[in-house]
Amino acid sequence: MAGVRQHGWRAIPAVCSEYGADTLPDRYRSDGRCLLFRQQAGISALKQELEVKTPYRAMNHPVIGVVTKADLASMEQISLVKCWLREAGAHNVLVTSAVNNNGVTELFALLHTEEGCR
């Protein structure tokens, strides 16, 4: 497709403690601390000549917060992480567990709505 650019995703892992969030070179922790991922996801096809080049372009994208592995966390931990995600700018916060298949359908439904895709 000539003149079309596709954007992928990237993930930045971080561990939250009482001192804040620290980025990690590895993806998983075995010490039980809360692991967060900030992902910028989206596949869009834009004509290159219409693409706006600005360092603040990502600021106009919607933010969806997703709490994963909910089957391993307590309700208190889940509530705390949901609060952090809302404070970070997430308009929609979903709780998911692939083991129990909880929240996965809701996540896909949100991603396929105009509100989730804007």
UniProtKB/Swiss-Prot annotation:
One GO molecular-function entry: ATP binding
SS bond list: none
Protein name: Uncharacterized protein YoeF
Gene3D superfamilies assigned to the protein according to its UniProt record, in alphabetical order: P-loop containing nucleotide triphosphate hydrolases
GO BP term (any one): biogenic amine metabolic process
InterPro entries per record: EutP_PduV (IPR012381), P-loop_NTPase (IPR027417)
